[in-house]
């Protein structure tokens, strides 16, 4: 069963600040690899070897948030599987008609009400839906119950902040920063160790839930080897948010002590770190691993786009630590700083998108 972990879902609801209206960056990443995923599944998914009498095909989206991207990703998978099923049924009469069961998983305080309220009506004729609350850093579904698992832009969220980075007596104390920007070697090492541990737990749980021959599709962001987080636009954004918090402490809105104890449970691995963490799990084979540019990485994103996206992503974790009254002022200050000092995207080093397909042995 799922083990306890820090719980910071995306901003819920359906207002202007919610994740549902501020996740187009993530959708662009999903769209960017859709054709490659389609091609792989068509060529490699073997329904007959899974079970010639298979009548219910099960899909799980881990870290689904509140939509709409989860519905988009799931529908892509279903469309591909239906096409593959049609092809196999024409070639072999043993192939049974298929129904689809989809499990939508996220943290218990994820806004599942908004998720299912905004589910496309057409999808209800395509598959049966189930919400599964629980951290994916542990099992959330029965053994051998899933044919395809999917997760998109989730595993950079750690199960917890490494304890050392909040310890004033540790060399890894991250006093002047709110995230792992790779400026302090000991901080980077603490985050890296936590990421490797979490990825191991994640893959172990998925290996138990997937049927033999089942696929785990993982999409997320990483850093090219040798690139530091502070050199990317995303790193600059988080450092700027940290600067805004310092300004608010000066004004008495929050305190230095609270800021010193605040770190984001987020780590973007370098490519070699990511591959090493995945290869540790012997119950999967790496069927495909590609590192590609995000479709929007070369675009000069507007200040409003950046502010809205990061508010939707970070407001829950910020509110939990500093209190809800801080959020509005923080992002007002953040928008002001971006206006005064726009990010020069051309000078920033690029984060990359990893697209990995694993097969359960």
From Swiss-Prot:
Binds 1 Mg(2+) ion per subunit. It comes from the Eukaryota. Keywords: Magnesium, Metal-binding, Methyltransferase, S-adenosyl-L-methionine, Transferase. Mg(2+) binds at residues 174, 260, 262-263. Its cofactor is Mg(2+). S-adenosyl-L-homocysteine binds at residues 19, 64, 69, 106-107, 135-136. SUPFAM superfamilies: S-adenosyl-L-methionine-dependent methyltransferases (SSF53335). GO terms for biological process: methylation. Its EC number is 2.1.1.-. GO terms for molecular function: metal ion binding; methyltransferase activity. Homodimer. Belongs to the methyltransferase superfamily. Type-7 methyltransferase family. PANTHER family: S-ADENOSYL-L-METHIONINE:CARBOXYL METHYLTRANSFERASE FAMILY PROTEIN. This is Probable S-adenosylmethionine-dependent methyltransferase At5g38780. It comes from Arabidopsis thaliana (Mouse-ear cress).
């Amino acid at each position: 069963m799922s083990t306890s972990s820090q719980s910071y879902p995306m901003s819920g609801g359906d207002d202007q600040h919610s994740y549902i209206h501020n996740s187009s960056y993530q959708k662009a990443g999903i769209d960017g690899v859709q054709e490659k995923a389609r091609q792989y599944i068509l060529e490699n998914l073997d329904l007959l070897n899974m079970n010639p009498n298979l009548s219910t095909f099960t899909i799980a989206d881990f870290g689904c948030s509140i939509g709409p991207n989860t519905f988009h990703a799931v529908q892509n998978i279903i469309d591909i599987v239906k096409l593959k099923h049609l092809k196999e049924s024409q070639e072999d009469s043993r192939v049974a008609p298929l129904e689809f069961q989809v499990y939508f998983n996220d943290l218990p305080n994820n806004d599942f009400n908004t998720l299912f309220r905004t589910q496309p009506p057409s999808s209800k004729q395509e598959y049966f839906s189930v919400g599964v609350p629980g951290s994916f850093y542990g099992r959330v579904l029965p053994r051998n119950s899933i044919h395809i698992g999917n997760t998109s832009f989730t595993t950079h969220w750690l199960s917890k902040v490494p304890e050392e980075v909040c310890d004033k007596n540790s060399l890894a104390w991250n006093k002047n920063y709110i995230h792992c920007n790779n400026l302090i070697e000991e901080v980077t090492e603490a985050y890296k160790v936590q990421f490797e541990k979490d990825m191991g737990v994640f893959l172990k749980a998925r290996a138990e839930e997937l049927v033999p021959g089942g696929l785990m599709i993982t999409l997320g962001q990483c850093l090219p080897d040798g690139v530091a987080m502070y050199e990317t636009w995303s790193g600059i954004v988080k450092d700027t948010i940290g600067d805004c918090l310092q300004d608010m402490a000066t004004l008495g809105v929050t305190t230095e002590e609270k800021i010193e104890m605040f770190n984001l449970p987020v780590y973007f691995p370098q490519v070699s770190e990511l591959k090493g963490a995945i290869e540790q799990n012997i119950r999967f084979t790496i069927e495909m691993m590609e590192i590609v540019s995000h479709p929007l990485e070369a675009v000069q994103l507007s200040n409003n786009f950046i502010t809205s996206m990061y508010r939707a992503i970070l407001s829950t974790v910020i509110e939990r630590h500093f209190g809800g009254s801080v959020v509005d002022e923080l992002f007002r200050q953040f928008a002001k700083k971006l206006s005064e000092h726009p990010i020069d995207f051309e000078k920033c080093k690029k984060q990359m998108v990893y697209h990995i397909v694993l097969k359960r042995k």
